[in-house]
Amino acid sequence: MLFRSLVTYLSLVSSVLSIASIKVEGNAFWDSESGDRFYIRGVDYQPGGSSELEDPLADTNVCERDVKYFQELGINTIRVYSIDNTKNHTECMDTLAKAGIYVILDVNTPHSSITRSDAACSYNTDYLQEVFASIVEFAQFDNTLGFFAGNEVINDGPSLEAAPYVKAVVRDMKTFIKNRGFRTIPVGYSAASVDEYRLPSGLYFNCGDDDMARIDMYGINDYSWCGDASMTTSQYSQQMKDFANYTVPLFFSEFGCNAKRPRPFSEIEAIYSTEMSSVFSGGLVYEYSEEASNYGLVELKGDSVTTNDDFDNLKSQFEKTKNPSGDGGYLKSTGGNKCPPKSNIWNVTEEIPDTPKGALKYLKGLAEPTGHGFDAYVQGNCNAKGNNVDDTGNYTSSITASSRASPSQTSQVSSSSATSANSTSSKKNDAAVEGAGFLSVIALAAGIALL
């Protein structure tokens, strides 16, 4: 019995310690243990799409069904657009970690995000509570590669008014991660590849004196390489020029034009070549499952997965295309870029709004944020009671990184004043704690063996 328990515990510990976290240095990603440069080879993953919203990382059966196909493709990263922060994601994240797969997570849901129509009101305490609750849930996993604070919020002139609020969310997320004592997890923005806004957006989110308000990575949703295009007939060459001196990791957060199907994915050879590695760090193919937009690599029907020619072509391209050797000619940069000049196309203030006062208790690590998952309808909660009231004086103790609340099963969205500061449970997830437990079990086993 003791031996069986020991084996079970060793299996748990090995899984916890099975994958190195990814860090940012200069304009590249790096394996924190080996020191090797890390290139994103991945797919965008949201089975059901936005019309049938489900959390694929909370369903163990779905996760186990799909991870074998991730491995067959040879990918190392998935991007997930929405999760339910009331649920537990440990089993799936552990399954992915064992397969060597990282997750880039968008922290927003359809009704909990910065809106283009009223960015000021959607940036409120209840919204930030949802964001912070998602961070608490996923910061515990070493294979959480990073978080996106927004996706394609800026796509035309009127939407520029939302830019300062998205940047404020970046600041709040990074501040929350730091103050809670979590490891440094990259926070970024995923941009629509609209010619006139792609570069200024990238510069804007990576400029200014406050490094907490600057992104750590920038994703571009690009579909300019169609069929058997080239660096010049697509927009790849232009983007290489535009971002030659960009100081944080840049990658394609979506790519894979479907004007011609099956897609040949000939761009893979370019993306993972020395011609692009000085600026780009890989990308994510849109998308894993066939949805209404017809970009899928597989067809899902219940527990059944059927791969298509797109899947086979992508697999073949990944198999024959290796990453550049060494550091790939990365830019050893520090600090941000210059802010984009104002023009008739780009007219955005460099000042960003203050954090709603009701959210300060979370930023200061005094209260545990409570998520409400897909039931969070908070975009109009700027007038909610307590949204802009500093109630930090009501709290006396701080929450550490190794103390976190179990996922809430709350079914109703509470107002800003109805937060659960006392919902913290001491669930230890720090690798050092697991390591200490590991040594204790070894010592116990050794003692038993001597009897």
From Swiss-Prot:
Q: Which domain of life is it from?
A: Eukaryota
Q: Which residues form the propeptide?
A: 431-451
UniProt topology in membrane: Lipid-anchor; GPI-anchor
Lipid-carrying residues in chain (GPI-anchor amidated aspartate): D430
Any one annotated GO CC term: yeast-form cell wall
Q: Where does (1,3-beta-D-glucosyl)n 1 bind?
A: Y81, N108, T109, P110, H111, S112, S113, I114, T115, R116, N151, Y286
What triggers its expression? Answer: Transcript levels are elevated during host infection, and transiently increased after induction of hyphal formation with serum. Expression is controlled by CWT1 and induced by fluconazole.
The residues forming a coiled coil are: none
Which Pfam families does the protein's record reference?
Glyco_hydro_72
What is annotated as the active site?
E152, E254
Point out the glycosylated residues in this chain: N88, N245, N347, N394, N422
Protein name, entry field: 1,3-beta-glucanosyltransferase PGA4
